[in-house]
């Protein structure tokens, strides 16, 4: 309710505990923020999603739709989105931690799968460039923004989330390959 600007004394009062009790478990405010990150963000990440995305026996479109249906169910919650936005506005590291996590556990995996589906070199042979990574952020960010409109701005899109995800995946899979063929260099 007060974001990350509140002090531990006020937090203790709201929780009905003493401030020393908070410091017993969290020696610093940074430790408390890291615990919030782990609880709010990392516990929402399902490691099975990475297995799903890597399952080349299933069509890529099907894997991406299944992933984003699960992922959006986990993060399109007012508290999750508010904490994410407030921490970003305050310059806290939570956002940088999460962005790094998403790049490592999701976007690079999607880049690899899209490359393989389009006969491009694997990321092991030709690492993902900053330009290529931004193409996948564009795709991912579009889906994320649906949640902001619905949960934060309280202006739900007129298209169902399922249809929006399917359309986003289709647009990426059909539109991105020509750009990737220009952006991804041949292996050396």
Positions of predicted regions on the chain:
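Amphipathic alpha-helical packing segments from all-alpha helical-bundle domains
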Residues: 62, 73, 83-85, 93-122, ...
């Amino acid at each position: 309710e007060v974001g990350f600007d509140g002090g531990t004394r006020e937090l203790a009062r709201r929780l009905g505990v003493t401030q020393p009790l908070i410091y017993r478990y969290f020696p610093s405010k940074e430790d408390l923020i890291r615990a919030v990150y782990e609880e709010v963000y990392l516990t929402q990440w399902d490691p099975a999603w990475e297995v799903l995305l890597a399952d080349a026996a299933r069509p890529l479109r099907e894997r991406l739709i299944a992933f984003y249906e699960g992922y959006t169910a986990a993060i399109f919650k007012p508290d999750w989105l508010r904490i994410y936005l407030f921490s970003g506005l305050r310059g806290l590291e939570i956002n940088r931690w999460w962005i790094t996590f998403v790049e490592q556990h999701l976007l690079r995996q999607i880049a690899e799968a899209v490359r393989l589906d389009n006969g491009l070199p694997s990321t092991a042979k030709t690492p993902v460039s900053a330009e290529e990574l931004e193409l996948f952020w564009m795709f991912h960010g579009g889906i994320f923004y649906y949640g902001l409109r619905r949960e934060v701005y309280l202006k739900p899109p007129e298209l169902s989330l399922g249809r929006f995800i399917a359309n986003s995946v289709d647009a990426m899979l059909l539109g991105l390959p020509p750009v990737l063929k220009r952006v991804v260099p041949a292996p050396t």
